[in-house]
Amino acid sequence: MRIFYGLLAFLVARQHDAQAIQARSDKEQPQTVVSGTAVQSVVPVQAQLGSGMGPSSSSSSASSASGGAGNSAFYPLGPNVMCSFLPRDFLDCKDPVDHRENATAQQEKKYGCLKFGGSTYEEVEHAMVWCTVFADIECYGNRTFLRAGVPCVRYTDHYFVTTLIYSMLLGFLGMDRFCLGQTGTAVGKLLTMGGVGVWWIIDVILLITNNLLPEDGSNWNPYV
């Protein structure tokens, strides 16, 4: 019974770690690189709120407050924010490009990942990706830009809890290895009935210690 509760506590901890990596990446202050012509520097507020502001200057300020991309300068008190400051919920971002450890290609393109995967935040590489603002969202500046701080991880259909259940209940048939895409190893495990039980137990331990991962290099999917 103690072993069952211990495994249950470990499962909860693993799920929390996977969600923490994504949450910490989302909460970090995003750094953006705007493509094309750089946006002009912010107009001082004092220049817009001078003591001699009359009716004509009021209408001029109202026009500037619309903050469209066609204006020559960004009005900080207007209704529009910089497109590059928008949260991820308002952006359509492409998946990180896999350069397959080709540092030269990454330096030339200025975006993409050298490697994917990692169990902790420090192990996961973060890279730039191209993002585009959704069509119905109004903002100031270029609507397509590079956004930094995106974690280099892939999520497929591999779930840790499901794989662990397969390993504990059907591990002697190699079901866990089949689930991870390791077909050759799974057949060997099936023919030997889980290595007469020894291989079965070892794979359960490897899963719990995060030393047995999907064959395609993806991370455990934290989303159900």
Swiss-Prot record:
Position of the signal peptide: 1-18
Topological domain ranges for the Extracellular compartment: 19-154, 211-224
Biological processes per GO annotation: positive regulation of Notch signaling pathway
Keyword 4Fe-4S in record: no
Glycosylation sites: N102, N142
Residue span(s) of domain TM2: 157-205
Keyword check for Glycoprotein: yes
InterPro entries linked: TM2, TM2D1-3-like
Gene null: resulting phenotype: Viable but females are sterile. Reduced adult lifespan. No morphological defects of the eye, wing, notum or leg. Eggs produced by mutant mothers fail to hatch and embryos display neural hyperplasia.
Membrane-spanning intervals of the chain: 155-175, 190-210
GO cellular component entries: plasma membrane
Compartments where located: Membrane
Membrane topology reported for the UniProt record: Multi-pass membrane protein
Note: This protein is named 'amaretto' after the sweet almond flavoured Italian liqueur because of phenotypic and molecular similarities with TM2 domain-containing protein almondex.
Family of the protein in this entry: Belongs to the TM2 family.
Function description: Positive regulator of Notch signaling. Maternal neurogenic factor involved in Notch signaling-dependent neuroectodermal specification during early embryogenesis. Functions cooperatively with amx/TM2D3 and bisc/TM2D1.
Protein known as: TM2 domain-containing protein amaretto
